[in-house]
């Protein structure tokens, strides 16, 4: 497994792979890898000849400096996990390598609408940072496919739109959420939970499933469903942050023509902001 830290070396390897006619898959990550990331890697390996995993804690997508400062950097352990998975290439650049003149004056990619609604409204600049780094990685790695987790539902929708709008010839693969046995969605942020909070955390998925059950039973008073769900989260020890029920295909308000809904939930548990989602077919 190659570990590359500079743009010239990465370009050199990508040129070689292209000359050899290899099908390349990219898995963009911020490191601190868990089994959910490994599921992305496995999906990439099944679909391509060569798998490139990027590990870069992107300062442009953090709306709070303290979050950036405390985000775990575990490059050695991450590379050991990826080596066991037989990943071909790890791209682990420094911030200086990606943003040589800093982030303030760096060219950015913005996806109007999707970047400022829902999760984007509570995290200003976050999705602009995501679309900028992902587009830069697409230009550098030139993958045939790229794999992203469905846990970050809005992020996946944003990347699909960016790819369509910018004409990237890349297949975007959404990989289903991987959960612990108790239902908690795997996330790097779960590491912020205390032992006691970890026992409470599966309650998020229980509330999510309760909303889904109501929708499947034909309930359509979305405001009431959301209000009750927020109360349930708070009673379980969370601080409900945002609960939305949206059209799964557009992320707009659910309408009579909506065929699928996505339930998007964000809640604080101690210092960890947990997010989860669930899709529901609307009869």
UniProtKB/Swiss-Prot annotation:
List of residues binding ATP: 30-37, 149-152, 178, 186-189
Temperature-related activity annotation: Optimum temperature is 30 degrees Celsius. Stable up to 37 degrees Celsius and loses activity almost completely when incubated at 60 degrees Celsius for 10 minutes.
The keyword NAD is annotated on this UniProt entry: no
Keyword annotations: ATP-binding, Cytoplasm, Ligase, Nucleotide-binding, Pantothenate biosynthesis
Name of the top EC class for this enzyme: ligase
InterPro entries with a match to the protein in the record: Cyt_trans-like (IPR004821), Pantoate_ligase (IPR003721), Pantoate_ligase_C (IPR042176), Rossmann-like_a/b/a_fold (IPR014729)
Predominant location: cytoplasm
Pathway per the UniProt entry: Cofactor biosynthesis; (R)-pantothenate biosynthesis; (R)-pantothenate from (R)-pantoate and beta-alanine: step 1/1
GO MF annotation, one: identical protein binding
Miscellaneous comment: The reaction proceeds by a bi uni uni bi ping pong mechanism.
pH-dependence annotation: Optimum pH is 10. Stable from pH 5.0 to 11.0.
Catalytic activity: (R)-pantoate + beta-alanine + ATP = (R)-pantothenate + AMP + diphosphate + H(+)
Its job: Catalyzes the condensation of pantoate with beta-alanine in an ATP-dependent reaction via a pantoyl-adenylate intermediate.
Family as reported in the entry's similarity comment: Belongs to the pantothenate synthetase family.
Mechanisms controlling activity: Activation requires a combination of a divalent cation, magnesium or manganese, and a monovalent cation, potassium or ammonium. Above the optimum concentration for activation, magnesium and manganese are rather inhibitory. Also activated by 2-mercaptoethanol, dithiothreitol, cysteine and glutathione. Inhibited by divalent cations (mercury, cobalt, zinc, copper, silver), chelating agents (EDTA, EGTA and o-phenanthroline), and analogs of beta-alanine (taurine, gamma-aminobutyrate, gamma-amino-beta-hydroxybutyrate).
Chain sites annotated for binding (R)-pantoate: 61, 155
Pfam family, one: Pantoate_ligase
EC code(s) of this entry: 6.3.2.1
Protein's name in the database: Pantothenate synthetase
């Amino acid at each position: 497994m190659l570990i590359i830290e500079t743009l010239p070396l990465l370009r050199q390897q990508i040129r070689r792979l292209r000359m050899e006619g290899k099908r390349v898959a990219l898995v963009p990550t911020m490191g601190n890898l868990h089994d959910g990331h490994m599921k992305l890697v496995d999906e990439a390996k099944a679909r391509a000849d060569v798998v490139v995993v990027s590990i870069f804690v992107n300062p442009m997508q953090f709306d709070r400096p303290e979050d950036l400062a405390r985000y775990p950097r575990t490059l050695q352990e991450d590379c050991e996990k990826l080596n066991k998975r037989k990943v071909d290439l790890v791209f682990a650049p420094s911030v200086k390598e990606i943003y040589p003149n800093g982030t303030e004056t760096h060219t950015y990619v913005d996806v109007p609408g999707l970047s400022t609604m829902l999760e984007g409204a509570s995290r200003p600049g976050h999705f602009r940072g995501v679309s900028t780094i992902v587009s830069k990685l697409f230009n550098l790695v030139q993958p045939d496919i790229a794999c992203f987790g469905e846990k970050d539902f809005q992020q996946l929708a944003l990347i699909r739109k960016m790819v369509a709008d910018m004409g990237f010839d890349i297949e975007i693969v959404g990989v289903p959420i991987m959960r612990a046995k108790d239902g908690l969605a795997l996330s790097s942020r779960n590491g912020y939970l205390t032992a006691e909070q970890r026992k409470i955390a599966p309650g998020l998925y229980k509330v999510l499933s309760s909303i889904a059950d109501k929708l499947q039973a034909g309930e359509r008073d979305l405001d009431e469903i959301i209000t009750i769900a927020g109360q349930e989260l708070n009673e379980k020890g969370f601080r409900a942050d945002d609960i939305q029920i949206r059209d799964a295909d557009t992320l707009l308000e659910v309408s009579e023509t909506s065929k699928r809904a996505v339930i998007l939930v964000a809640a604080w548990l101690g210092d960890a902001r947990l997010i989860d989602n669930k899709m529901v077919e609307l009869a």
